[in-house]
Amino acid sequence: MLEKLAVIGLCLGTLLPALAQAAPAEKPKAHGSLGLDSTKKALESGDEARTLAALDEIELSGDGRAAPLVEALLTRGASAKILLRAIGVAGALGKPSSSAAIAPYVKHRAAEVRRTAALSLAHTKGDVAVKALRDALRGSDPALRGTAADGLGALGAKDAVPDLFVVLPKEVPEAAGAIGVLCAGDECKRFVALLGKLPFDVMQSGFLPLLLRTGAEVPDTAKLQLIEQLRRMATQQANALLATALASYPAAGNPKIKAAIDAALHGHTVTSGEL
């Protein structure tokens, strides 16, 4: 018995140092390696290489204390290369205070700067971000309109649904996706009624989120109407959408809607009497 204990002790004595060496060290706090004073000087230096290196360091650290420094840079203005990086870093930090500094850039002359600004506003959030994205929907840049629509959906900007309907006929599929996430009541019925009037490829991104929403904002009658219209289409795309909806239908959803989807996939007519 004593010999066995001695062997176990010897094994543990050999393993513990190795385990201690293999164990990962505790990660330092994100702001530990970021010197705000030196970072501020680099951002104000006017030297492109130093400025870009400082922005890289800020993003790597994830230190929200640096957000005002990036905001100040955006307010001062810079070359397109620096602006792109600064806007992206501000978005990565995700501070609502940064939205005011980013917002003007959705109207920048360079398309890439405009789209990067719209992407970052979806992360910095707030009323300023929502207003800027709604303004971006009215622009002439199709890619910017799509990015703005995505951002409004991500931000839960329900007041923007009327604006999204305006750009939907301009073949902005991202607007359909956002409407499917945000619509309520008659807005959802209006959206479903557009099936067949607008190209399916434009509309389809909004159908799945609409069918899978569990709150009372989306009328079940609108869901049943959509299910029946998709059944009547009898296309591969429509059937695939219904199959995806059935496979991912939430447990908290109305079981009658789930049953209606299943019935439609089997070729059975779906009516409001299903409720």
Residue spans for each PLM region:
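Bacterial N-terminal signal peptides
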Residues: 6-17
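Immediate post-signal-peptide N-terminus of mature secreted/exported proteins
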Residues: 36-37
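Structural detector for internal amphipathic alpha-helices that build alpha-solenoid repeat scaffolds
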Residues: 23-31, 41, 49-63, 72-73, ...
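Positively charged n-region of N-terminal signal peptides that target proteins for export
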Residues: 1-4
